[in-house]
Amino acid sequence: MKLTAEELLWDWCRQGWRYRGIGNQPRAAQDWYEARIRYEMELIVSKGFADFILFTSDAIRWGKDQGIPFGPGRGSTAASVVAYHTRITEIDPFKYQGMLFERFIDVSRSDPPDIDVDCSDERRDDVYNYLAYKYGAECVGHIGNFVRYRGKNSLVDTARVYNVPKWAKETVSNLIVERSGGDARFDESLADTAEMFPNARDVFDQFPDLWQALRLEGNVRGMSIHAAGLVVSSTPITDICAVYERNGVRVLALDKYDAEYAGLLKLDFLGLSTMGMIARFLEMTGLTLADLYAIPDDDKETIDVFRRGDVVGIFQFEGRAAKQVNRDVYPAHFLHLADINALARPGPLLAGITAEYCDVRHGRRQATHLHPMVDEFTRDTYGQIVYQEQILRILKDMAGFDWFSVGQIRRVISKKLGEASFQKSYQDFIDGCENTSGVSKEVADKIWKRIVTSGTYSFNIAHAISYSMLGFWTAWMKCHHPLEFYAASLAKADNAEARYRLMKDALGHDIQVVPPILNASRCTWRPSESLGLIAGWEQIPGIGAKTAAKIDEMRWGEEGGKFRAWSDLEAIPGIGPKTVEKMGVFATAHDPFGLHTTEKTMKKVRNFLRKQKQVPKPTHTGAQLADIVMQNNESHRFVKGPRVIYAGIAKSLNLQDVIENRRSRSGQTEEEILKTLKRPDLLEFCSIRCYDETDEEVYVRVNRFQFPKLRRTVGNIALNHDVIVVVGNRIAGFGTPVMVDQIYIIDPD
């Protein structure tokens, strides 16, 4: 008998009840699950979303049954018990009751909810092929994505068209700087580069045609494949829009907004490299997805990884802000990790919420009390409104808003529509608090101001829990299976700096990092109990994945065998005597991965500084700067710390603009921002990321008052080569920042 979508979804929920072992839980818990499922199902069915839930669940369940690693959840989907029972998520809402289902689906919603899913980047195509097989290849496709010109590709295209010499193009390309805080389309801008670096300007003046590249920046260059979006149609997609094929992959000539407008069913399956790393880890250890999903979130040894600050390679926790907030919070349990995820963002950091959370948590101050109901909703976050769900609960329970009205506020928060959009509900909130909870207008007004301020940066707790769970898994791997963790992480690290950090961290954990071994290496990194981390053939410069696979087959394949000498590799097509010689030199080098280069450079520079008198001698290393404890004053403005002199290798330069920075955070106009500035003629400032032999990142900041004086000096720094000696003050903030007023450049050669 054919079941309706509603009947089938109920059946899958009953299967999920058994799969999750709900029947083995206490009666009170079972009653809670049953009531929640009935409530959610009523809303899902009434909105016509049952088919969508079934469709999504089917694809994810198939993937999990095939051993494809999927993340525990993403976004507000994790708040749904139905999603948990149908195996869309692995987060139990009963365990984390701060999550709100209404954040996922509310009564005012007419369009299907967003269900974003993370899966292994190496097997995402398997999910696509399953959908194509089940629904027909002509009905399945990838969403397109508009690609815009940025500094480097506009430079490359312009140089090619006007036959500009390669050396000129590379001179400018190597000087392109980041610009954060503004429109992402104009990050890594050529205009910034030409303004900042005299030698870049010289190239532009020598080859005037290159100025055309500036006109391309920000314009559409073409289309690519969206990183996550898949669509399924009930009719051939070519009946709806144009489709083009690239390498056998069908791509719509629509972006995600146009695809939704056309009525196509959209799935967001993001191929996440962390999930790919986990897939490799499971293969190396022989563990299964079930083992991964069963990791207890109260594992003390894993929590200790975070308490030690041992977060290199840990998903969502190794960034400079998260690293600093993790250190300040000093987590005691899993939910503290979710709080760190939410607090390590510009909004709460700049608003002082992160600092106040830490102060209250460690008993340095009392939480601000506005009303007992607000205290109840913020008890677990030390009196701070950190999450969107806390705001929604205040609106619902304290002000008596119905879910339709709460849903409208939810959209204002999630779409970041700004304070003006909040004000439409101000009077309703004031009246609602008085009529529902007997709260005076004065107190309600204070609560409202707190809501409006928090609403501009508050985070989704379901997403914070989901991604903290993924971070917890990676920390568990690092703690209990370190060899396999490092090998899998190195195999998936997508840039040289990430690989360097992982290798240095492995050495710090007494795990050796060895170059390729003729008869022991595979294509990429592999763990060895006796030797440590053995590099693969792909780690040798000039050896690509295809060549590495041929070497691997020759050594480990059915017809393969041990190599007698490096010269045996010459039997492989594409590998000649010179290549073999280079491979042998790399494999026998003293420091093939450059793990001691920074140490050698800094030792050489420090010896030079001790012998001369023109440049101040450093007083602190990066690690010593990080250990300086910074205090906050009552207004949460960071006070200036001690005077310091620091020396480190300049790695990257980030140029920023006050107008762009504030406008992106506050929504204020340029005129409004300029009125608040002292010296509105000074707008630019910059940050230089540095390392020394302690491998502690230090952010050298040049404020807008000092920038005009130091602009030329900053422009003369050769990144990834020069050592800079800076004089300034240690200041508080994420990372290890130093506000400087003097910069000296040392050429280590």
Residue positions per predicted region:
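Noncatalytic, beta-rich nucleic-acid-contacting surfaces in large DNA/RNA-processing enzymes
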Residues: 1-749
